[in-house]
């Protein structure tokens, strides 16, 4: 199983990123756990300086899908260990392809959720393939999540880093980075296809 940041889908809300706690190694982080000291969720609108990405509010991400628009979306937050591993790769691949990245931050600096349950519910139809059930059976979005959207539909996506990588324990190996680069490049390439 991949380690990753995730957001809880129990209540309908936007994507959030948090650090997965527990014994199972994952390539993503649990972002919805408001009570978790390890929650890693992106929040608010980052300045263009945050990774050099274009800030996008959660409601605007939902509207992008509903209005049939296109773009490369990144859901995550600065304190998420898996996001910190994936962002440099995403930056590199997007720069090489000349693709802008829209950043949806799911938690603020105090790791408070920046989305409502209603917002989360509205995004589920578009991102359910990139969500998973948490240990309580609640549909959750783990971050980082990178999706290419064309005409309001996800054409490619990537969750977490790579299978077998636990960002809490260390950085990706050279082989894991190569695998992550290939997977993220596929998503970026799908976003540049007009």
Regions found by a protein language model. Name each.
Residues 1-10:
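Bacterial N-terminal signal peptides that target proteins for export
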Residues 5, 24-68, 170-171, 179-194:
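N-terminal leader/targeting and pre-domain segments
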Residues 16-18:
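C-terminal motif of bacterial Sec signal peptides marking the signal peptidase cleavage site
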Residues 66-78:
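Short active-site neighborhood of thiol/selenol oxidoreductases, capturing the structured segment around
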Residues 80-83, 146:
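The canonical Cys-X-X-Cys-His
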Residues 84-97:
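Typically the conserved alpha-helix immediately C-terminal to a functionally engaged Cys/Sec
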Residues 104-155, 187:
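Thioredoxin-like thiol-disulfide oxidoreductase module
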Residues 137-194:
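Non-catalytic, surface beta->alpha helical segment in thiol-disulfide oxidoreductase systems
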